[in-house]
From Swiss-Prot:
Gene Ontology terms: cellular component: ribonucleoprotein complex; ribosome
Family affiliation: Belongs to the bacterial ribosomal protein bL34 family.
Region of interest called Disordered, as start-end residue ranges on this chain: 26-45
PROSITE patterns: RIBOSOMAL_L34 (PS00784)
NCBIfam families named among the record's database cross-references: rpmH_bact
Organism this protein belongs to: Parafrankia sp. (strain EAN1pec)
One BP annotation, GO: translation
An annotated Gene Ontology molecular function: structural constituent of ribosome
Protein name, as recorded: Large ribosomal subunit protein bL34
InterPro entries: Ribosomal_bL34 (IPR000271), Ribosomal_bL34_CS (IPR020939)
Amino acid sequence: MSKRTFQPNNRRRARTHGFRLRMRTRAGRSILSARRSKGRSQLSA
């Protein structure tokens, strides 16, 4: 039996996909603006 690949960890989740990480780069900011224009209720992790 192989182990499950998803091992939940909220801190790691926020640090790799979080809002502040998205705001750091130009590409990340474009992702956020795209999600805003689409009307997503949750912008990032």
